């Protein structure tokens, strides 16, 4: 799978840093608010909201805070009017990067994203410059402890497109976006608890990076993730577990 497990590791490291800076909750609340506004306040009928709530619960956000964010998005409370914006660019070694933002000020956001790219040796591209390298994909991820054999049959029976074992032994179940909910629910009903489950942007091909470019790439990803308006960053970078461990 094109860089998914490696990026999951980078995200995990970054997630810990974000939590310390108080940024993670801000981003989760913003996502819950927008998901509620665009798809309604019932997570049973709003897959995006359910995913956002699941992430918030994993991050130990209180149910009261989650409920306030849902009400804010559904119009039961006053709130900022955020819009979704996607930027495309290039990282070190020509790595393709997608940056999804929720912003109340496009001018501020594009300036900050452009600055992050330039400071890390990349550059902001034009619309369509790299988006064609990614496809919207449901990904239900399981730990290495569970193993491929436990996951494979129920996943394929539920309508998954593929089951991929990553370098670290973790298992990713890939689905079409419109099958994501059904597959996730079927796996949970079979007693399999995912580490994460979301509809994401998956690169069709990946680019292996050496240590030097990997270090630059991680710096770019961290600069982008540090921005308040940035919700998700996707790339087609393939960074080996060994290099990630070295860069620690």
UniProtKB/Swiss-Prot annotation:
Coiled coil: none annotated. GO terms for molecular function: DNA binding. It comes from the Bacteria. NCBIfam families: PRK00110.1 (NF001030), PRK12378.1 (NF009044), YebC/PmpR family DNA-binding transcriptional regulator (TIGR01033). It comes from Methylococcus capsulatus (strain ATCC 33009 / NCIMB 11132 / Bath). This is Probable transcriptional regulatory protein MCA1220. Signal peptide: none annotated. Gene3D superfamilies: 1.10.10.200, 3.30.70.980. Belongs to the TACO1 family.
């Amino acid at each position: 799978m094109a860089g998914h497990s490696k990026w999951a590791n980078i995200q995990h490291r970054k997630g810990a840093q974000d939590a310390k800076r108080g940024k993670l909750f801000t981003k989760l609340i913003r996502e819950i608010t927008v998901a509620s506004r665009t798809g309604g306040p019932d997570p049973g009928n709003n897959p995006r909201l359910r995913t956002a709530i699941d992430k918030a619960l994993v991050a130990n956000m209180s149910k009261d805070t989650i409920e306030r964010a849902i009400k804010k998005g559904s119009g039961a409370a006053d709130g900022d009017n955020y819009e979704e914006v996607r930027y495309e660019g290039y990282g070190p070694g020509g790595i393709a990067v997608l940056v999804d933002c929720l912003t109340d000020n496009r001018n501020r956001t594009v300036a900050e994203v452009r600055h992050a790219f330039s400071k890390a040796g990349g550059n902001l591209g034009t619309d369509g410059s790299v988006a064609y390298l990614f496809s919207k994909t449901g990904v239900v991820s399981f730990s290495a402890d569970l193993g491929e054999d436990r996951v494979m049959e129920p996943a394929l029976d539920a309508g998954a497109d593929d089951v991929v074992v990553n370098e670290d032994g973790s298992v990713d179940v890939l689905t079409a976006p419109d099958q994501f909910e059904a597959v996730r629910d079927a796996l949970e009903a079979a007693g399999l608890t995912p580490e994460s489950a979301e509809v994401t942007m998956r690169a069709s091909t990946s680019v292996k990076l050496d240590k030097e470019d990997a270090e630059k790439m991680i710096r770019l990803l961290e600069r982008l993730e540090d921005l308040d308006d940035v919700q998700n960053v996707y790339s087609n970078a393939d960074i080996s577990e060994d290099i990630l461990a070295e860069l620690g």
